[in-house]
């Protein structure tokens, strides 16, 4: 984080203690900012609630200092309802330099990232038939995925 750019980073299991603290923060009574979206597409309805908290109000100083200019914690609560009535519910957590008050802007960054990821995976599957790959031994699947991404980057230039 050398530059002064804004960031929105997905919080995953590789930061176990921080992930637990962030998750716990959303069960408290801190001041929160929320933004809701509803999308109907491809035979499903997706409801998303983006909730942001000021990081300094819920994390200790050492946790905040570990992330340059950390300003907010974000929870995305996503409920997907399929046309047959089946529901899938998931929560994801993010760290951001953007202020919690800007939760709508933060949501657009998160959705934009999902769009890029979806297009990448679509290309890997359709162009390279990655889902049909039977490589399972040791690091073969990971190595082939890296080669496909490299090939896609070269072709896309």
Residue ranges and their predicted role:
Residues 1:
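Conserved PLP-enzyme active-site core in the AAT-like
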């Amino acid at each position: 984080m050398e530059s002064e750019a804004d960031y929105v980073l997905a919080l995953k299991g590789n930061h176990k203690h921080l992930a637990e603290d962030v998750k716990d923060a959303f069960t408290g009574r801190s001041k929160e900012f929320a933004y809701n979206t509803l999308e109907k597409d491809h035979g499903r309805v997706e409801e998303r609630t983006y909730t942001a908290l000021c990081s300094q109000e819920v994390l200790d100083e050492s946790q905040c200092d570990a992330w340059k200019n950390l300003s907010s914690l974000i929870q995305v609560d996503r409920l997907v309802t399929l046309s047959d009535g089946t529901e899938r519910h998931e929560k994801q957590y993010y760290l951001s330099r953007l202020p919690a008050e800007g939760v709508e802007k933060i949501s657009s960054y998160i959705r934009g990232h999902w769009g890029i990821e979806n297009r990448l995976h679509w290309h890997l599957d359709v162009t390279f038939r990655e889902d049909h790959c039977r490589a399972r031994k040791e690091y073969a699947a990971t190595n082939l995925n890296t080669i496909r991404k490299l090939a896609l980057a070269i072709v896309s230039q």
